[in-house]
């Protein structure tokens, strides 16, 4: 029996994608081979690779000024790869910290140059909001400004992207990429690990503006130098072939759903249902300011935290799994990515209401 999986990542996948991958496991397209067995330079995999790139560019409306790269290392790896690619000319970068992931980025970049905390969304209740542009204190001519546009742990999402003029904006969009349309032209660099909305763990998508390919540090490994990867069409080293194949299936699934505008409407409906349930109750609490609440990652706390394990056990018995909050913040977290159906969220809120009534 399939469960409703609320994991933050690796996360729920579209069942249609899983079934197609299963059907093609031993023989992709009449080739007599699994995708796992293909040469990454063979015509079969090159077809998969090019279709994935084309479909992703179409879904996100990526302009011709930007390259799409398939890399390895995950979002966490990009915390080092970004400064090594952008600090070659200016060894200073600014950071807007809105949660745990941008904190990690801020700390990692200190190994490669001077970093400046331009703004923080931390309050007495933890990370609960996104500082407005007027609150940012930018340094003089930084190499880039880094922003995590969706904080997976704290459930904080950035919806308003400021115009920084000539300063490149770097966005870690790992946990909400493909959940809604985005104006890619506003970003110098946008990256995301695959294991949320793109597919399975193993491939990292990096979208980088052409003019930023000439700014790498000499210490940057060639396998992670964006210019080298771009010139070689993400084939400089052996790419994560099966992860790219799965991502390609997800892209086609998204197109069949109506693209990102249609997906956004579904995600708004799911998030509203869950947040309304939390807000209408004195038994559950979400601490994030309403205009910064993530549509993808919804953390919440029980008024009586001694009942956390009972809540999780009861949820699991209902087929509602992976609801435990991150160890650094506790409580619960429901990650409701694209592949989590509305029926799953309805089942969760029904259980939440019943659990509250039993404890009343």
UniProtKB/Swiss-Prot annotation:
Which molecular function GO terms apply here? O-phospho-L-serine:2-oxoglutarate aminotransferase activity; pyridoxal phosphate binding
Gene encoding this chain?
Answer: serC
User: What does this protein's record comment on cofactor binding?
Assistant: Binds 1 pyridoxal phosphate per subunit.
UniProt key word Transferase: yes
Its lineage reads:
Bacteria, Pseudomonadati, Pseudomonadota, Betaproteobacteria, Burkholderiales
GO BP term, example = pyridoxine biosynthetic process
What organism does the UniProt record list as the source?
A: Paraburkholderia phymatum (strain DSM 17167 / CIP 108236 / LMG 21445 / STM815) (Burkholderia phymatum)
Q: What class of enzyme is it?
A: transferase
Which cofactor(s) does the record list? pyridoxal 5'-phosphate
> Where along the chain is L-glutamate bound?
41
Binding residues for pyridoxal 5'-phosphate, per the UniProt record?
Answer: 101, 152, 172, 195, 237-238
Can you say what this protein is called?
Answer: Phosphoserine aminotransferase
Give the pathway listed in the UniProt entry for this protein. Answer: Amino-acid biosynthesis; L-serine biosynthesis; L-serine from 3-phospho-D-glycerate: step 2/3; Cofactor biosynthesis; pyridoxine 5'-phosphate biosynthesis; pyridoxine 5'-phosphate from D-erythrose 4-phosphate: step 3/5
Q: Which Gene3D superfamilies match?
A: Aspartate Aminotransferase, domain 1, Type I PLP-dependent aspartate aminotransferase-like (Major domain)
User: What are the annotated GO cellular component locations?
Assistant: cytoplasm
Keywords of the record: Amino-acid biosynthesis, Aminotransferase, Cytoplasm, Pyridoxal phosphate, Pyridoxine biosynthesis, Serine biosynthesis, Transferase
> Which NCBIfam families does the entry link to?
PRK05355.1, serC_1
**Assembly mode:** Homodimer.
Where in the cell?
Cytoplasm
* Claim: Amino-acid biosynthesis is one of the keywords in the record: yes
Residues that bear N6-(pyridoxal phosphate)lysine: 196
């Amino acid at each position: 029996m399939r469960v409703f999986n609320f994991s933050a990542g690796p996360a729920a996948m579209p069942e249609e994608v899983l079934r197609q991958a299963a059907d093609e496991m031993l023989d992709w397209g009449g080739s007599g081979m699994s995708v796992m067995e293909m040469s990454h330079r063979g015509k079969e995999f090159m077809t998969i690779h090019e279709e994935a790139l084309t479909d992703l560019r179409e879904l996100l409306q990526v302009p011709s000024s930007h390259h799409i790269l398939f890399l390895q290392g995950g979002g966490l790896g990009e915390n080092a790869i970004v400064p090594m690619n952008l600090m070659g000319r200016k060894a200073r970068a600014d950071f807007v910290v809105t949660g745990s992931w941008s904190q990690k980025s801020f700390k990692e970049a200190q190994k490669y140059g001077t970093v400046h905390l331009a703004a923080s969304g931390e309050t007495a209740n933890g990370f609960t909001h996104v500082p407005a542009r007027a609150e940012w204190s930018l340094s003089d001519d930084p190499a880039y400004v880094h922003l995590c546009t969706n904080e997976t742990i704290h459930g904080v999402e950035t919806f308003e992207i400021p115009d920084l003029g000539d300063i490149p904006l770097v966005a870690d969009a790992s946990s909400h990429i493909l959940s809604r349309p985005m104006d890619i032209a506003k970003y110098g660099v946008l990256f995301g690990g695959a294991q949320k909305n793109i597919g399975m763990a193993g491939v990292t998508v990096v979208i980088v503006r052409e003019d930023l390919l000439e700014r790498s540090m000499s210490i940057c490994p060639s396998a992670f130098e964006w210019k080298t990867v771009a010139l070689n069409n993400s084939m400089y080293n052996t790419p994560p072939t099966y992860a790219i194949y799965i991502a390609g299936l997800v892209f086609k699934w998204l197109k069949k759903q109506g693209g990102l505008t249609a997906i956004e409407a579904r995600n708004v409906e799911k998030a509203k249902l869950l947040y309304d349930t939390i807000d209408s109750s004195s038994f559950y609490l979400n601490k994030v300011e309403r205009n910064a609440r993530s549509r993808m990652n919804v953390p919440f706390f029980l008024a009586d935290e001694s009942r956390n394990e009972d809540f999780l056990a009861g949820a699991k018995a209902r087929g509602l799994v992976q609801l435990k909050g991150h160890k650094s913040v506790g409580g619960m977290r429901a990650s409701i990515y694209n592949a989590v159906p509305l029926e799953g969220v309805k089942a969760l809120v029904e259980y939440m209401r019943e659990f509250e009534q039993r404890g009343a």
